[in-house]
Amino acid sequence: MGNAAAKKGSEQESVKEFLAKAKEDFLKKWENPAQNTAHLDQFERIKTLGTGSFGRVMLVKHKETGNHFAMKILDKQKVVKLKQIEHTLNEKRILQAVNFPFLVKLEFSFKDNSNLYMVMEYVPGGEMFSHLRRIGRFSEPHARFYAAQIVLTFEYLHSLDLIYRDLKPENLLIDQQGYIQVTDFGFAKRVKGRTWTLCGTPEYLAPEIILSKGYNKAVDWWALGVLIYEMAAGYPPFFADQPIQIYEKIVSGKVRFPSHFSSDLKDLLRNLLQVDLTKRFGNLKNGVNDIKNHKWFATTDWIAIYQRKVEAPFIPKFKGPGDTSNFDDYEEEEIRVSINEKCGKEFCEF
């Protein structure tokens, strides 16, 4: 036993060292953000991959190199109307400063009179959401493989004082090796201590957000519980037709498990979907280690996952660079750029 404990101890030490170095790297970029690193004319626009309330994501090709990227285009006037200025500035400032194997990379960012542009690595496997809906549910080993990547990603983000706040299968892309790329940092925020903004997706909201309490990084660990449940069951733990009914279920502290869930899985989920913050895993004195050392993760080699050495349970079909068959089709729209600058002041730091 002594040996195993010693190994665990030294692993936890090297994680500490790793995170200290990661924080240095992050802070350099956080304090001195990259700005205006490309121009719209350098990209050939190919196809819309997704749409949102104030913009769209398009597959583009960098004319000079022939590389494909995903370009997020945000309409400045719509961002202002929807009161998302702060969130949008957060997203870009955070994305340009982070670096982790399971976070989508921001390659370029720029703006023009009408829009903000974030050009990211293109992840051709599509959303976990579409694969989960097609397959129905993931086996526990399959769900565990993805969950481990989220645990490591949250450990990294939280060590930088970042809360993610938008975990859901739609925001997890599957890359060519079958690993996860977390995308959409629209709700991510750097916060020491507590924050109060109501944001997120109804099914994934922690009770303390619904109850308008100040909340912290523990909301991400609650959301991890929701995600693991949804991956392993095929449906989320709290669902109803109306958000208000979902919220009632979430704050009730009651959750029911499918009969096929293993007892280890149920135990982990009871500790993540824990309404009492003083008992929720990830938020206790041992932090993330309560999760990493849980029996459900007994077979997980955390370092091998980080190094992407574990064989993925599922590799998305891929027909070559620029293949979009893992994404839905959307109506195409011209990108219109005004001759006058819109909302210059609001987005001067972008």
Swiss-Prot record:
<keyword id="KW-0449">Lipoprotein</keyword>
<comment type="similarity">
    <text>Belongs to the protein kinase superfamily. AGC Ser/Thr protein kinase family. cAMP subfamily.</text>
</comment>
<comment type="function">
    <text>Phosphorylates a large number of substrates in the cytoplasm and the nucleus. Phosphorylates CDC25B, ABL1, NFKB1, CLDN3, PSMC5/RPT6, PJA2, RYR2, RORA, SOX9 and VASP. Regulates the abundance of compartmentalized pools of its regulatory subunits through phosphorylation of PJA2 which binds and ubiquitinates these subunits, leading to their subsequent proteolysis. RORA is activated by phosphorylation. Required for glucose-mediated adipogenic differentiation increase and osteogenic differentiation inhibition from osteoblasts. Involved in chondrogenesis by mediating phosphorylation of SOX9.</text>
</comment>
<dbReference type="GO" id="GO:0005737">
    <property type="term" value="C:cytoplasm"/>
</dbReference>
<dbReference type="GO" id="GO:0048471">
    <property type="term" value="C:perinuclear region of cytoplasm"/>
</dbReference>
<feature type="domain" description="AGC-kinase C-terminal">
    <location>
        <begin position="298"/>
        <end position="350"/>
    </location>
</feature>
<keyword id="KW-0808">Transferase</keyword>
<feature type="binding site">
    <location>
        <position position="72"/>
    </location>
    <ligand>
        <name>ATP</name>
    </ligand>
</feature>
<keyword id="KW-0547">Nucleotide-binding</keyword>
<keyword id="KW-0539">Nucleus</keyword>
<dbReference type="InterPro" id="IPR017441">
    <property type="entry name" value="Protein_kinase_ATP_BS"/>
</dbReference>
<feature type="lipid moiety-binding region" description="N-myristoyl glycine">
    <location>
        <position position="2"/>
    </location>
</feature>
<keyword id="KW-0723">Serine/threonine-protein kinase</keyword>
<dbReference type="InterPro" id="IPR008271">
    <property type="entry name" value="Ser/Thr_kinase_AS"/>
</dbReference>
<feature type="modified residue" description="Phosphoserine; by autocatalysis">
    <location>
        <position position="10"/>
    </location>
</feature>
<dbReference type="GO" id="GO:0034605">
    <property type="term" value="P:cellular response to heat"/>
</dbReference>
<feature type="modified residue" description="Phosphoserine">
    <location>
        <position position="139"/>
    </location>
</feature>
<feature type="modified residue" description="Phosphotyrosine">
    <location>
        <position position="330"/>
    </location>
</feature>
<protein>
    <recommendedName>
        <fullName>cAMP-dependent protein kinase catalytic subunit alpha</fullName>
        <ecNumber>2.7.11.11</ecNumber>
    </recommendedName>
</protein>
<dbReference type="InterPro" id="IPR000719">
    <property type="entry name" value="Prot_kinase_dom"/>
</dbReference>
<dbReference type="GO" id="GO:0005952">
    <property type="term" value="C:cAMP-dependent protein kinase complex"/>
</dbReference>
<dbReference type="InterPro" id="IPR011009">
    <property type="entry name" value="Kinase-like_dom_sf"/>
</dbReference>
<dbReference type="GO" id="GO:0005829">
    <property type="term" value="C:cytosol"/>
</dbReference>
<feature type="modified residue" description="Phosphoserine">
    <location>
        <position position="338"/>
    </location>
</feature>
<dbReference type="GO" id="GO:0036126">
    <property type="term" value="C:sperm flagellum"/>
</dbReference>
<feature type="binding site">
    <location>
        <begin position="121"/>
        <end position="127"/>
    </location>
    <ligand>
        <name>ATP</name>
    </ligand>
</feature>
<dbReference type="GO" id="GO:0004674">
    <property type="term" value="F:protein serine/threonine kinase activity"/>
</dbReference>
<dbReference type="InterPro" id="IPR000961">
    <property type="entry name" value="AGC-kinase_C"/>
</dbReference>
<dbReference type="GO" id="GO:0005634">
    <property type="term" value="C:nucleus"/>
</dbReference>
<feature type="binding site">
    <location>
        <begin position="168"/>
        <end position="171"/>
    </location>
    <ligand>
        <name>ATP</name>
    </ligand>
</feature>
<dbReference type="GO" id="GO:0005739">
    <property type="term" value="C:mitochondrion"/>
</dbReference>
<dbReference type="GO" id="GO:0001669">
    <property type="term" value="C:acrosomal vesicle"/>
</dbReference>
<feature type="active site" description="Proton acceptor">
    <location>
        <position position="166"/>
    </location>
</feature>
<keyword id="KW-0597">Phosphoprotein</keyword>
<keyword id="KW-0067">ATP-binding</keyword>
<dbReference type="GO" id="GO:0007165">
    <property type="term" value="P:signal transduction"/>
</dbReference>
<feature type="modified residue" description="Phosphothreonine">
    <location>
        <position position="48"/>
    </location>
</feature>
<keyword id="KW-1003">Cell membrane</keyword>
<feature type="modified residue" description="Phosphothreonine">
    <location>
        <position position="195"/>
    </location>
</feature>
<dbReference type="Pfam" id="PF00069">
    <property type="entry name" value="Pkinase"/>
</dbReference>
<feature type="modified residue" description="Phosphothreonine; by PDPK1">
    <location>
        <position position="197"/>
    </location>
</feature>
<dbReference type="GO" id="GO:0005524">
    <property type="term" value="F:ATP binding"/>
</dbReference>
